[in-house]
């Protein structure tokens, strides 16, 4: 059994190739005849010179004929079929596997390169994250320390300021009361008992009267110690003219329901 028996199409392929060669030879002979005709025409013209346009036209005509013949040959030519023997199949398989291997190696190389770049990016981002966490921890510690310092400083500062203000107010109050006492003792003294005895309509009382300064201190202390009930009972030690003086000048107010009780006007409110 020979190769032609294994491949029945091989005889047909050989015949097609032979026919194509014969046709190509005929076309070449026709082109040769055309060239001879052109040569004869040139000989008949003699010494006449062809113009550039005629010469170019002749060359173009020849090129068109050559290209037409070549195109016709390729159109009529059928691809040669390779007999699919075991060796051929193995060779084709090896070529395909080799090509596939090269493609896969290229893809693998690309993926490895991308993975390497992603790994570098991940490491860089991780380092950045660690640095940010360290900075955040440091800032938290610093914030906590500053907060404690500010709170301690603020509390101690406020306490010292309030203490200083209270001392200043206390000193000012004592100074004001001292000045007020001196003023009241000079201008509003207690009634002279010798003068009282001369007046027939005034009975001598065994009660010790208090000064206007002492009356005001009682009213002031009551106002600040018991602000919800600042009224004071008018006792026998309060000299009535001084009580009326305080009421007439708006320094003291009577209780709306009990006229025997008075209070100091809240000038500080």
Swiss-Prot record:
Designated gene of the protein: CENPK
Places the protein is found: Nucleus; Chromosome, Centromere; Chromosome, Centromere, Kinetochore
Predominant place of localization: nucleus
Protein name: Centromere protein K
Site (Breakpoint for translocation to form KMT2A/MLL1-CENPK oncogene): 96-97
Domain of life: Eukaryota
InterPro entries per the UniProt record, alphabetical: Centromere_CenpK
Record keywords, A-Z: Centromere, Chromosomal rearrangement, Chromosome, Coiled coil, Kinetochore, Nucleus
Protein family: Belongs to the CENP-K/MCM22 family.
Segments forming a coiled coil: 22-42, 98-151
Region (Disordered): 1-20
Compositional bias (Acidic residues): 1-10
Biological-process GO terms, alphabetical: chromosome segregation; kinetochore assembly; mitotic sister chromatid segregation
GO-annotated cellular components: cytosol; inner kinetochore; nucleoplasm; nucleus
Organism ancestry: Eukaryota, Metazoa, Chordata, Craniata, Vertebrata
Record's disease association: Chromosomal aberrations involving CENPK are a cause of acute leukemias. Translocation t(5;11)(q12;q23) with KMT2A/MLL1.
PANTHER family, A to Z: CENTROMERE PROTEIN K
Function text: Component of the CENPA-CAD (nucleosome distal) complex, a complex recruited to centromeres which is involved in assembly of kinetochore proteins, mitotic progression and chromosome segregation. May be involved in incorporation of newly synthesized CENPA into centromeres via its interaction with the CENPA-NAC complex. Acts in coordination with KNL1 to recruit the NDC80 complex to the outer kinetochore.
Quaternary data: Component of the CENPA-CAD complex, composed of CENPI, CENPK, CENPL, CENPO, CENPP, CENPQ, CENPR and CENPS. The CENPA-CAD complex interacts with the CENPA-NAC complex, at least composed of CENPA, CENPC, CENPH, CENPM, CENPN, CENPT and CENPU. Interacts directly with CENPH.
Tissue: Detected in several fetal organs with highest levels in fetal liver. In adults, it is weakly expressed in lung and placenta.
